[in-house]
Amino acid sequence: MKIRIFAVVCLLAANLFTISAQKWFTPEAEKQVDALLSQVVEGNYKNNRYPLLRKPLMELPLGSIKPKGWLHEMLVRQKNGASGQMDVLYPSVMGKRNGWLGGDGDQWERGPYWIDGLLPLAYILDDDVLKAKVQPWIEWALQSQREDGFFGPEKDYPGEPGLQRDNSQDWWPRMVVLKILQQYYSATNDKRVVAFMTKYFRYQLNTLPQKPLGHWSSWAEFRACDNLQAVYWLYNLTGEDFLLELGHLLHRQSFSFIDMVDRGDLRRPCTIHCVNLAQGIKEPIIYYQQDTDRKYIDAVKEGFRDIRRFHGQPQGMYGGDEAMHGNNPTQGSELCSAVELMYSLEKMVEITGDIDFADHLERIAFNALPAQISDDFMTKQYFQQPNQVMVTRHRRNFDQDHEGTDLAFGTLTGYPCCFSNMHQGWPKFTQHLWYATPDNGIAAIVYSPSEVTANVGDNVPVVISEDTYYPMDHQITFTIKEVRNKVKQVKFPFHLRVPKWCKQAEIRVNGKMEQTVKGGKIAIVDRIWKRNDKIELYLPMEVFTSTWYENAVSIERGPLVYALKMEENWEKKEFKDSWYGSYYYQVTSSDPWNYGLVDFDRNRMNEVAQVSINSQKQQLDFPWNQENAPVEIKMKARLIPTWTVYNEMAGPQPFSFCGSAEGGEQEITLIPYGCTTLRISEFPVVGK
């Protein structure tokens, strides 16, 4: 029987090639796609097909996970902010002239970047207005495909200020569109996407030997993993062998991150562009699905160790402004790097099940991301600094300077890529809170208030709510809201990640102790579940420290880094021309910032650090600003008079125990990094 099914699949796979001869998606082509897809036999959700490595976690269909609480508020602010109106705010690029809508305007990455975030936002919120903004981009991309499989803009135009329209053939922006179409299929099951990608990937297999990834630009070489993961995604749907051949070819032509790590490039500055690193670092693990040599995972892990040591910043990012630029806490970290590294971590945890990647993902999402975008989601910083004491228009010690606008909150301040690309961060984070598991269970891998609808057990739909104020509270409550079968109960395993920072978690089921679990593990509760059953997960949050540049110390509690609370004076400024937008905000403070923490016993942090929690603020929909921060930590500190402003930023960092402090001890207040704009998050340590 298995041999017969295999033969049928092979025959149908061969027949699918004839789709490429169709002018477009005819009824005959649709029948062939239907036949091929119907042969896929899986559990509740599709895992990797042989010979690809089976994944321990599987992404759920787009729209299965809905945000609640503060996360829902974040996405609504995003919808009402820039994400929902880029065509109005940035019409020169996102308007009707865009090449990805058939116009003669910008035809490179920026338009696809926006849709790569807008599409998941639209379907997660189930918002018809946003879906209507997305659909013309989908339709034009699908209809643009040529007979040979190529798609997208294909005519170059003379340069025009503010537009990128002279490299229409480049492989790179098409990789972003492939991500968009994957998500669109996940939300809609539009079978045109399958035929479209099949045709394009045959074109790539035929064309890449003559016009490799680096033929038009180097960007595609560094970011080929986004192309590669789309190839594997399609292979899991159709099983066509040529896709595996293309997978090997894309890997061979891509930049070798393994060689980069082996050369020690990440131990030196300026060896790679910061966003290329954020996007491309997942390539070895994406390819590991096809070539299961452990060296691919080991290289990525070693790469992250090098990044942490030589470029690392406490909010989960690294000094990269735009080249990798060391770990001084006044070096910038680009917003594109944050959202792209989040996506890379989401994919790497799915493939490996390694919860180090999930811990890292939360560190970025709960610290770096909310700090770099304004509360109304209308402006952003191109770069952020861990020690950021002035947000002004001024040239700083960055690898790239854009007329001093890189720290300013604005629309096109710095470089426009981040204004176009920032939209994917929170929607994709929401989409990857939950995963399906091969044992027909469900896994809560990253935590935030949400609700998931998924099939478990013997393909039984369930609805599970997650109620929490995490990451600013330690308790997470899961409730089985619905079991959609006749008996209203179903047996399935419930997987729960326990972060490494948690010494020991407690899990209770319906009020009774179920188990305790050490940090850094996945707990599994496997039982018969029925409506209104509850799981309570307790993740005790203790204060601890981490050590950074010049032996500086950061204060952490749970997944959050804490930073000096400073008065923030926001002032709107007008630009004389529109190159960087029409306006920007500068943020300044009259508060002192040059504190060193008074030396303390790291083993007695619960006594040294005084934690206060405002339970009323834990009821607010939006915790991510200074006013609403529900958790504060008090620490003893002394001023360091020699630590002064340099170049409108914190001057050279005093080495811990070498700086001379002045005056008596003072009590300073720390709040979550993600609630700050001005801050010190890496403190020198001084004597008592």
What name fits each language-model region?
Residues M1-K23:
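Bacterial Sec-dependent N-terminal signal peptides
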Residues Q22-R110, K131-K155, K191:
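Low-complexity, Ser/Thr/Pro/Gly-enriched N-terminal "stalk/linker" regions
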Residues K23-V40, V300, A358-N367, Q372-K488, ...:
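C-terminal beta-rich recognition modules with glycine/proline-rich loops and embedded aromatic residues
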Residues W70-W100, K133-F150, A195-P212, E245-R263, ...:
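Long, well-ordered core segments of solenoidal/helical folds
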Residues D87-G105, G152-D170, W216-L234, D262-E283, ...:
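Carbohydrate-binding/catalytic loop surfaces
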Residues W100-D104, L121-R252:
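Extended ligand-binding groove/face enriched in aromatic
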Residues D106-Y123, Q169-Y185, A220-N236, I272-Q289, ...:
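Well-ordered alpha-helical segments within folded domains of soluble proteins
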Residues C502-R527, T545-E550:
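Solvent-exposed beta-strand/loop surfaces of large extracellular or lumenal domains
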